[in-house]
UniProtKB/Swiss-Prot annotation:
Related illness: Microcephaly, Amish type: A disorder characterized by severe congenital microcephaly and severe 2-ketoglutaric aciduria leading to death within the first year.
Reported impact of residue 37 to A: Decreases thiamine pyrophosphate transmembrane transporter activity
UniProt keyword DNA repair, yes or no: no
Motif Substrate recognition, chain ranges: 241-246
Effect after changing residue 82 to A: Does not affect thiamine pyrophosphate transmembrane transporter activity
Name this protein carries in UniProt: Mitochondrial thiamine pyrophosphate carrier
Membrane-crossing segments per the record: 19-39, 87-107, 122-142, 173-193, 220-240, 293-313
Residues recorded with modification Phosphoserine: 51
Length: 320
């Protein structure tokens, strides 16, 4: 059970254990889904249509993009920006899950609402994600820059990237795309947590008793379903965020096709609609859905697994 559980036999994890479980969950998930993230970002930043019929398009499908990136940049390209991405995932996972557990407990103790309700999980999940985003957003900008650059590289190391970006674009560069990120992350994370809880209830109702023994599989499947639902409903805002994060980085994007500049969130949405059509809002959706299913599934699976491990350790220690 993710979130505060008022039942007497609920998990009794400490806040430190919750943070560790969230961190490890982020670390494991990031290592597994990094290739999908790189492909998704390349698709999102390509202004040309993702179609073979457009001769100027560099990428037009998941398999074609995978082969081309592999041929041009080698297998390590699928883990470009992996160091800042891991820092991002570890920090984000810790803050998000710790905040969510604390917020749901606060709601249960300080209001008439049940901490396990859909609406409570939606609001608490969204707020927890916003707190985590504010904490790690500078690292997210670095990760996007590393994943977006082709060859020759603009940034060689993390330290080089931080220094170059600070000198050429100022300190505000590390919070580029923050507004659309917060706007997108609240409903996305809120739907992740609330849909995960709802799908678990549905799973328990629909699956016979003998099929409920494997709780890990249940967590993985429900997490994957929650990831697909939440990503589909909030995807355009994620695309705007990525486009805005590479503002000022246009020289490194020239090798991938057209280059555009955006004045802000609304201007970005307007230009995408005018020049790429409504389907432009969903560029990169297919790898994103695959990534969302895997990442959200593994995120909840890993978090629940390590929380259960800590719970068993605590119970054993208390019985001595």
């Amino acid at each position: 059970m993710v979130g505060y559980d008022p039942k007497p036999d609920g998990r009794n994890n400490t806040k430190f254990q919750v943070a560790v479980a969230g961190s490890v969950s982020g670390l494991v998930t990031r290592a597994l889904i990094s290739p999908f993230d790189v492909i998704k970002i390349r698709f999102q930043l390509q202004h040309e249509r993702l179609s073979r019929s457009d001769p100027s398009a560099k990428y037009h499908g998941i398999l074609q993009a995978s082969r081309q990136i592999l041929q041009e940049e080698g297998p390590t390209a699928f883990w470009k920006g992996h160091v800042p991405a891991q820092i991002l995932s570890i920090g984000y996972g810790a803050v998000q899950f710790l905040s969510f557990e604390m917020l749901t407990e606060l709601v249960h103790r300080g209001s008439v609402y049940d901490a396990r309700e859909f609406s409570v999980h939606f609001v608490c999940g969204g707020l927890a994600a916003c707190m985590a985003t504010l904490t790690v957003h500078p690292v997210d900008v670095l990760r996007t820059r590393f994943a977006a650059q082709g060859e020759p590289k603009v940034y060689n190391t993390l330290r080089h990237a931080v220094g170059t970006m600070y000198r050429s674009e100022g300190p505000q560069v590390f919070y580029k795309g923050l507004a659309p990120t917060l706007i997108a992350i609240f409903p996305y994370a809120g739907l992740q947590f609330s849909c995960y809880s709802s799908l678990k209830h549905l799973y328990k109702w629909a699956i016979p008793a003998e099929g409920k023994k494997n709780e890990n599989l249940q967590n993985l499947l429900c997490g994957s379903g929650a990831g697909v639902i939440s990503k589909t409903l909030t995807y355009p805002l994620d695309l705007f965020k990525k486009r805005l994060q590479v503002g000022g980085f246009e020289h490194a994007r020239a090798a991938f096709g057209q280059v555009r500049r955006y004045k802000g969130l609304m201007d970005c949405a307007k230009q995408v609609l005018q020049k790429e059509g409504a389907l432009g809002f969903f560029k990169g959706l297919s790898p994103s859905l695959l990534k969302a299913a895997l990442s959200t599934g593994f995120m909840f699976f890993s978090y629940e697994f390590f929380c259960n491990v800590f719970h068993c350790m605590n119970r054993t220690a208390s019985q001595r």
